[in-house]
């Protein structure tokens, strides 16, 4: 079988709260680091989440 295009990533909050989301991304369409603004329930605000590897 062929290797899948999608890889699992972890989105870590830039607020420094330790909160994270897990998702996957298409390596071919988005080769760079993924950044998105999402809600952080610890600080109760929308903040930037940056891609990190799942350990």
UniProtKB/Swiss-Prot annotation:
GO terms for biological process: translation. One of its GO terms (molecular function) is structural constituent of ribosome. InterPro entries: Ribosomal_bL33 (IPR001705), Ribosomal_bL33_CS (IPR018264), Ribosomal_bL33_sf (IPR038584), Ribosomal_zn-bd (IPR011332). It comes from the Bacteria. Signal peptide: none annotated. The lineage of its organism: Bacteria, Pseudomonadati, Pseudomonadota, Gammaproteobacteria, Vibrionales. The gene is rpmG. Coiled coil: none annotated. It holds the Pfam family Ribosomal_L33. This is Large ribosomal subunit protein bL33. Belongs to the bacterial ribosomal protein bL33 family. Keywords: Ribonucleoprotein, Ribosomal protein. One of its GO terms (cellular component) is cytosolic large ribosomal subunit.
